UniProtKB/Swiss-Prot annotation:
It comes from Saccharomyces cerevisiae (strain ATCC 204508 / S288c) (Baker's yeast). The keyword Transmembrane helix applies. Partially overlaps IMA3. It is a multi-pass membrane protein. It is found in: Membrane. Keywords: Membrane, Transmembrane, Transmembrane helix. Its main location: membrane. This is Putative uncharacterized membrane protein YIL171W-A. The keyword Mitochondrion does not apply. The chain crosses the membrane at residues 15-35, 51-71, 73-93, 110-130. One of its GO terms (cellular component) is membrane. Disulfide bonds: none annotated.
Length: 150
C-alpha cells in the first residue's frame, strides 16, 4: 500500500460491534445478512453518516484470528472439507467456557486450530495465526449456503 492510499482508510459502522464475548450473535447476523437481507439491507454499504472516524496508519496490518462457521441450525452448508484435529480443543472447551477459550486463544502467539460449539447448535472453527501486535477477528462462512426451507 502506498502512502497516498494510507489516508483513504475509513472505519464503517457495524450492527453488532466485534467483541470476543458476543461472537455467536455476530455469526448469526452475518448468516442472516447473506441469506435474507435481514432488517437493515442498506447498512452494508458505507454512507456519509456511517463513517465513525478516519483509519489510522494502514501500513500496520497484522495477522488475524479466523473464525469460520461450518454448521448451524436451519441452514445447510455444503462443499466444506475442513476438519481439524480435535483432541486438545475439546478438552479446553470442557474445562473453560467458550468466551474464556476465545479470549485465551486471542492472547496467545501460536497457530492453533479448534472446533467448539456455541448456542443453538452453531459450530465454530477457530484458527489462531501468530501475530505481531494486535489481531483482528474475521468471521466468514465456509461452504455454500443452501436454502431448502419451505
Amino acid at each position: 500500500m502506498c502512502l497516498f492510499d494510507q489516508g483513504k482508510a475509513v472505519l464503517v459502522r457495524t450492527v453488532g460491534w466485534p467483541d470476543l464475548f458476543v461472537v455467536g450473535n455476530i455469526v448469526t447476523h452475518i448468516i442472516l445478512w447473506r441469506v435474507v437481507k435481514w432488517r437493515d439491507p442498506n447498512g452494508i454499504g458505507t454512507k456519509l453518516f456511517d463513517v465513525l472516524q478516519l483509519g489510522g496508519n494502514t501500513l500496520h496490518i497484522t495477522p488475524t484470528i479466523v473464525v469460520g462457521v461450518f454448521e448451524t441450525c436451519g441452514i445447510n452448508l455444503i462443499n466444506c472439507g475442513l476438519f481439524p484435529p480435535l483432541g486438545f480443543c475439546f478438552w479446553m472447551c470442557r474445562r473453560n467456557s467458550h468466551c474464556t477459550l476465545l479470549s485465551y486463544l486471542y492472547e496467545k502467539t501460536f497457530t492453533f486450530v479448534c472446533v467448539f460449539g456455541l448456542v443453538n447448535g452453531t459450530y465454530i472453527l477457530v484458527q489462531l495465526i501468530p501475530r505481531v501486535k494486535k489481531s483482528s477477528l474475521l468471521i466468514y462462512v465456509c461452504g455454500r449456503l443452501t436454502n431448502d426451507r419451505k
